Design a protein with these regions (language model features):
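Edge-of-domain interaction segments
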Residues: 1-72
């Protein structure tokens, strides 16, 4: 099996807004970050480490529960 380098994202955290992404917590703020899926596991996916601006980055705090499609 190949080795994939990426950011592990729980499937239940994934939302669809302007493409596929997740909400992340920035202090008190909630922000939407796109993900660039490079591998699909059972209950998670891996997002590219170097996808660029507007995409999930390694140290982002992913919100898994309690956020609806509008970020509330």
């Amino acid at each position: 099996s190949g080795e994939y380098e990426g950011i592990k994202v729980p499937r239940k955290a994934i939302r669809f807004q302007d493409g596929k992404g997740v909400y992340v917590k920035l202090g008190e703020r909630i922000s939407f970050k796109k993900i660039d899926v490079i591998y699909e596991g059972g209950d998670y996916v891996l997002s590219s480490l170097n996808a660029g601006d507007g995409y999930l980055s390694l140290y982002d705090d992913i919100v898994v529960e309690g956020v609806d499609a509008n970020g509330n």
